């Protein structure tokens, strides 16, 4: 019952965020707002497919490629959004860059015990790119961490991605009650992150954004 309510809450929040970002994109005609809309829309489509399968078949989708493709696209749009806001101007040091890219790879190897190999490889590649840009902005070796809007955007993206990883990890141990509740908490944290992407784009630009 709790899972159903949490999933419904995520669908509602995603729908509202998609509508708000679309209106902002049409009003401002700026690329960041359009990319944010596509991020929401892609994630929403993946969620809808997943929930339809749960509702009609009372089990997770046997053909998960449909939802996976939607979520791949969502993370790529988030990556493009960060790049558009200036994330390509910030880089990690060599050691930090290796550590950031190693994390998604190690997690993918861990998840392969339960999930599809190809899907985990794709997620590792996408998350490696995304984490590189996020940490490059938040922990830039040059000391220039970007403008206020970019920092808030990357901070929200970091929390969102880490919550996603936490929920994936918890789902691997679904039979353990304590970790199952952790999964719900992680998924709820992800849901609550969605509106903050809109708030981040509405933040006044700092010096590095100008």
What residues fall within each predicted segment?
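Hydrophobic transmembrane alpha-helical segments in integral membrane proteins
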Residues: 1-17, 113-124, 183-184
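Short aromatic-rich membrane-water interface segments that cap or initiate transmembrane helices
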Residues: 1-5, 61-70, 180-185
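Hydrophobic alpha-helical transmembrane segments of multi-pass membrane proteins
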Residues: 9-21, 32-56, 67-75, 104-107, ...
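Internal transmembrane alpha-helix with an interfacial aromatic "cap," most often the third helix
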Residues: 17-28, 54-62, 66-100, 108, ...
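Membrane-interfacial loop-to-transmembrane alpha-helix junctions, especially the N-terminal start
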Residues: 27-40, 89-99, 144-156, 206-210
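Membrane-interface helix caps and helix-loop-helix hairpins in membrane proteins
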Residues: 55-62, 109-121, 173-177
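Generic alpha-helical transmembrane segments
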Residues: 71-77, 119-134, 190-191
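C-terminal transmembrane-bundle signature of multipass membrane proteins
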Residues: 79, 131-210
């Amino acid at each position: 019952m709790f899972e159903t309510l949490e999933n419904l809450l995520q669908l509602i929040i995603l729908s509202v965020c998609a509508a708000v970002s679309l209106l902002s994109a049409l009003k401002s005609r700026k690329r960041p707002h359009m990319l944010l809309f596509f991020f929401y829309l892609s994630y929403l489509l993946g969620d809808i497919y997943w929930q339809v399968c749960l509702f009609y078949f009372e089990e997770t989708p046997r053909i998960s490629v449909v939802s996976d493709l939607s979520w791949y696209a969502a993370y790529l749009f988030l990556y493009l959004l960060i790049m558009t806001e200036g994330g390509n101007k910030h880089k990690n040091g060599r050691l930090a860059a290796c550590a950031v890219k190693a994390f998604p790879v190690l997690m993918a190897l861990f998840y392969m015990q339960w999930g599809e190999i190809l899907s985990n490889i794709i997620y590792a590649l996408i998350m490696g790119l995304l984490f590189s840009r996020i940490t490059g902005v938040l922990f830039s070796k040059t000391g220039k961490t970007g403008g206020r809007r970019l920092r808030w955007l990357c901070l929200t993206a970091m929390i969102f991605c880490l919550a996603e990883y936490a929920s994936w990890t918890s789902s691997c141990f679904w039979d353990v009650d304590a970790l199952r509740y952790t999964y719900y908490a992680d998924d709820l944290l992800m849901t609550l992150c969605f509106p903050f992407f809109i708030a981040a784009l509405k933040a006044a630009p700092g010096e590095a954004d100008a």
